[in-house]
Amino acid sequence: MESFFNNTFATLIAYIGIIFTYLLVIPLLLFYWMNNRWNIMGKFERLGIYGLVFLFFPGLILFSPFLNLRLKGSGKG
């Protein structure tokens, strides 16, 4: 078991998992949450979301060119 913890491969897998979670998984969940709750959030929920946006900013920047969070208009004119 000790050789597993000293293994470079295990360390590499751990780093990849952390980076994958930080840059891909949590920012996508955050985008989904903001898109669904933007108009009905309370002040403490909004404060928490702003804190998470600050914390996961690099991942949000990666997805920002591809996601559209603009409000849907009435469709007129």
Swiss-Prot record:
Keywords: Membrane, NAD, NADP, Plastoquinone, Quinone, Thylakoid, Translocase, Transmembrane, Transmembrane helix, Transport. It catalyses: a plastoquinone + NADH + (n+1) H(+)(in) = a plastoquinol + NAD(+) + n H(+)(out); a plastoquinone + NADPH + (n+1) H(+)(in) = a plastoquinol + NADP(+) + n H(+)(out). InterPro entries: NADH-quinone_OxRdatse_su_L. It is a multi-pass membrane protein. Disulfide bonds: none annotated. One of its GO terms (molecular function) is oxidoreductase activity, acting on NAD(P)H, quinone or similar compound as acceptor. GO terms for cellular component: plasma membrane-derived thylakoid membrane. Its EC number is 7.1.1.-. It comes from the Bacteria. It is found in: Cellular thylakoid membrane. The chain crosses the membrane at residues 12-32, 47-67. Pfam families: NdhL. Belongs to the complex I NdhL subunit family. NDH-1 can be composed of about 15 different subunits; different subcomplexes with different compositions have been identified which probably have different functions. NDH-1 shuttles electrons from an unknown electron donor, via FMN and iron-sulfur (Fe-S) centers, to quinones in the respiratory and/or the photosynthetic chain. The immediate electron acceptor for the enzyme in this species is believed to be plastoquinone. Couples the redox reaction to proton translocation, and thus conserves the redox energy in a proton gradient. Cyanobacterial NDH-1 also plays a role in inorganic carbon-concentration. This is NAD(P)H-quinone oxidoreductase subunit L. It comes from Prochlorococcus marinus (strain AS9601). The lineage of its organism: Bacteria, Bacillati, Cyanobacteriota, Cyanophyceae, Synechococcales.
